[in-house]
Amino acid sequence: MRTADAIVEILRREGVEWVIGYPVNHVLERGAAAGLRPIIVRQERTGLHMADAVSRVTSGRKLGVFCMQHGPGTENSYGGIAQAFSESVPILVLPMGYARRLAWVQRNYHASTQMQGITKSAEPVTSAKEIPAIFRRAFTRLRSGRGGPALIEVPVDVWNEEIDSIDYVPPRALRCGPDPAAVREAASLLLQARRPVLYAGQGVHWAEAWPELRRLAELLAIPVCTSLGGKSAFPENHPLALGSGGLAIPGTVHHFLRQADLIFGVGCSFTETSFGVAMPKGKPIIHATLDPLDVNKDVACSLAVLGDAKLVLAALIDAVEHQHGTTAKDAGPVAREIREQHDAWLASWMPKLTADDAPLSPYRVLWDLQHSVDIANTIITHDAGSPRDQLSPFWRCTEPLSYLGWGKTTQLGYGLGLAMGAKLAKPERLCINVWGDAAIGFTGMDFETAVRERIPILSILLNNFCMAIELKIMPVSTEKYRSTDISGDYAAFARALGGYGERVERPDDIVPAIRRGIAATERGQPALLEFITSKEVEVSRF
């Protein structure tokens, strides 16, 4: 058996269904021969974003795989790998490498060394017989601990080497439980607190700890907010839901965090970022995380509980029930306060959410979108900048993994690949990306990939003909050189690539256009709806 076939056989045993990539990489062709569907993209970054989403929407039960050629293909891939690393997403990256005799010749790009800073592990194959061990190490790291890309670089002169046999059994995920003493202390602190808040990060998604999070919240009548990455970990139509954090946040999140006397973060890193909610100063914090490197990193904690989010929450529920009993606390008073705060905040935004203006209010577009889709059967993601901040505070998720939030680093154009990868892994769902006229300039050509590969996503494009949030930052550049002016006819662009494209300019046409776009996706055709919007820059910040 040759190296390429051995790699494909390992991928088959690991349950891989798709190999996303760009030629030349022999896994694409040999995988196709073995029944693994190759997905060929127009630019490597989008393919990595697709692999990223496959892992996300399955909580890592299916792992996204991306492969590319050595040299320019690997170099082009850097941004997509870096994005997955910053968001702690496990993906398998399989670049070809230069022949071993040339691998260290300047200036050949050596992925397994150059990408060590943006991967959880990066390893070259120096001998074909080592392939089972190398892949076993990679998949163990992908399934265990904090997520991140694992990279295996296969030199071009290794692909045709022979392997006698494959001794390979897929490794199982490893999970670590918490220190019982820390759990008991955390339970006591939560029971003593008068105004605690639960803050859930994306670790709840990876651990599939949604039932435990809900049980703990209901047992202690604790309001729950999430990070942007953790959004949808707790149903946002629940009486105890506050919504999600981010650069823009609901008024409920601001109110309850500010008044909290204890914040319990679970499955989160508390990383300081411009695109996350800042923890109020001076609050006691319990930090439950899988990664000890996150403890006291950016936010000082009173107590750390290390372990898998599901195991931590299950142990904490047992400890609370042992100390308090199994009867849930009365959630009535806090639920009323949440409802009052939410209603007052939302009322202040209703003029924008229901505006009849032309150009359109982006808030009106997204409000109408939310009320035109089956929320429970939809997966949606934002893009960098205004689309993120205009969408995330107002979109109310009801099902786990129905919102792909991100923000540790914010590459424009990330959302398109996320929606496409989500649709691959969850074809029964309506998968939507919301982006602007800046983001489409980075990855828009891969809308053609969605058409060609029969991935019927719904793409919501907010076009205000400029980089609106840069106007105040670049007044001279704009006045003298129109440097912030960007745009095009993106509905026509979508049609030219074989998709459904429609431009919408009047408020009364928003909902009918959304329905036509959804109908197109149901026929198997990707749809791009281009909404001509105002230069809106106000977001829900406090």
Language model features with spans:
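Conserved structured core elements
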Residues: M1, G21, A207, H254, ...
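Short helix-loop-beta connector
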Residues: G60, I375-A376, P427-E428
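Phosphate/pyrophosphate-binding active-site segments
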Residues: K129, S165-I166, A187, G282-A384, ...
